[in-house]
Amino acid sequence: MDKKMKRTRIADALHGGLVGQEINIKGWVRTKRGNKAVNFIALNDGSTIHNMQIVADLASFDAAQMSQITTGACIGVIGTLVESQGAGQSVEVQASAIEIYGTADPATYPLQKKGHTLEFLREIAHLRPRTNTFGVIYRIRHHMAIAIHTFFHNKGYYYFHAPLITASDCEGAGQMFQVTTLNPDSLPRTEEGQVDYRKDFFGRHTSLTVSGQLEGEMAAMALGGIYTFGPTFRAENSNTPRHLAEFWMIEPEVAFLEIEDNMDLAEEFIKYCVQWALDNCMDDISFLSEHFDKELIDRLKFVLEKPFVRLAYTEGIRILEEAVKNGVKFEFPIYWGADLASEHERYLVEVHFKTPVIMTDYPKEIKSFYMKLNDDGKTVRGMDVLFPKIGEIIGGSEREADYDKLVARANEMGVPEKDIWWYLDSRRYGTAPHSGFGLGFERLLLFVTGMSNIRDVIPFPRTPNNAEF
């Protein structure tokens, strides 16, 4: 093979007007079929869901070499791109030279032509990118990340890198992974018998972050508008299709934004991401719609059709209580003060309003200490964006800008002042109204891909009792 000949991506060969030209493509064999005279090889290089058909006239190739080309093998092909005579593809490559980079023993290679369950593929997460399904999902994941950066960049917001190692628990939930270099077999102790973290690497108790919000607020108080986008960690012992121990979060924080502006931003943002997916990932989305979720494309278009409903929590409870009176059955009880379950959120979106909902003004008892208190003293300016199929997709609020009120709320919620002294400084010096929200990246991907298990939209899922690879 000509080592100097530039490689052409299959996506470009399929759509780039190269018919009649000699090209060099490289990729992994999906299938090989044929007869004594000719072999047809389906080659994929990850640039598109579509394979390139390679036509190899066996008289021109060594039989021993061709026998090594099996499903999973990696090869390079030089040949002429021609219009295809067969059904199923518009163009194909008439091979003049083939080089084998790596073979795949059919006796042991786990991804043979037959279909595989998603459960099985989770057990071989290191190989599942080679399947059509996961090639599609990881390309969509890339495009969604680009959409997020593009949206905020166009807004003039700055990408801010919040630390992954922290001494604060933003959510006050306490479900954090500890970071330590101490030997568990010989922990240093204080006179009171407690672990002496002064002897640890950082000289104090530290954990992996559950959110970059608090640090993000500090940046917003100087840069005006920022967003974080990075991994977060929750040591929540939940083995469900909706929970991961390691996931990615997008968290904008914007100075001078009040709750109404925050709702506008969240709606504009999520619609932008969905539209980006439809504009840039249609081949991949169509594959997922055909194989996993027939209603996927309609559901994506559904969220773009009209403005989201703005709904106060109290009114939402009234609607749900009315539904119960009319015979609707919910697993979890409905009452003012309840933290709504996914079934309640989905009823409001899918049955009652038939459009996404932004719920606001939640009881202060079920929300975090940093949310701004309303004038009624009972509710806070929190907001959740509720979507079909998954319920809450975004959670946010206007932040409490008043120092005394924030301290009072922290004390009320059992958050020690000594742990957030630096956070309180932003209210002590030049405080300003500001708002923000958090979007779990994998929740967004669940919606855009139509997949039903969050473990299938992240490359290497981390869940209880599972940290393979």
Curated annotation (Swiss-Prot):
Catalytic activity, reaction form: tRNA(Asn) + L-asparagine + ATP = L-asparaginyl-tRNA(Asn) + AMP + diphosphate + H(+)
Enzyme class: ligase
Keywords: Aminoacyl-tRNA synthetase, ATP-binding, Cytoplasm, Ligase, Nucleotide-binding, Protein biosynthesis
Intracellular or extracellular location(s): Cytoplasm
Subunit structure: Homodimer.
GO BP, sorted A to Z: asparaginyl-tRNA aminoacylation
EC number: 6.1.1.22
SUPFAM superfamilies according to UniProt: Class II aaRS and biotin synthetases, Nucleic acid-binding proteins
Protein name, per record: Asparagine--tRNA ligase
Higher taxonomy: Bacteria, Pseudomonadati, Bacteroidota, Bacteroidia, Bacteroidales
An example molecular function term from Gene Ontology annotations: asparagine-tRNA ligase activity
GO cellular component, one term: cytoplasm
Similarity comment text for this entry: Belongs to the class-II aminoacyl-tRNA synthetase family.
Predominant location category: cytoplasm
